[in-house]
Amino acid sequence: MLDDYEDGYVGTSHYQTFNPQVLRCSKKHKVLHLHGAIDYGFKPFGESNSAWIAPDLIPDLVKYSSYNLASEHSRPQFSANQAGYACQSSSIITGSNKTDKLIAVPFVFYNSEFVNSIIKNPSLLIIGYSFSDFHLNRVIDEVTKLHGLNRRIVIIDSIPDRAITHYVQASC
């Protein structure tokens, strides 16, 4: 178990808020929940996400101290994407139109950190990933281009025949 890690969430109340500066500056191991977590939820009704005059159109996710608290505040929130179509924000990213869902905080920062880590590092540890998300696969594809034969990808998964042959064969 990874005890000493950074995920960018800070605070001591019943929920923590995301601070991208904390994530960026930390020297600890970084845990990026690219598809969310069961202890994420939205702020209690009536609490604002920002100090801006205009309210946020896409609510930030906060991290609750327990799953039970998070589940009380995890109902999907609806807004519109740039094209004007309905977009659902949720504590777990599933289904189609994932790129629309990635603009919620912390996902937008987690994905940015993921891309920057790929650029800087030839090593990648993947745990329990289905390889069915184009936005992540595109970044993983770049590891070989960026790092050539120096790249190391370790995949830990309980399903042995997922779509990893592309990444394994690239080293031959």
Residue positions per predicted region:
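Extended, H/D-rich, highly charged conserved domains that either
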Residues: 1-90, 102
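SIR2/sirtuin-family catalytic core signature
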Residues: 21, 27, 97-172
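Gly-rich Lys/Arg/Thr-decorated short loops/hinges at beta-loop-alpha junctions or inter-strand turns
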Residues: 90-96
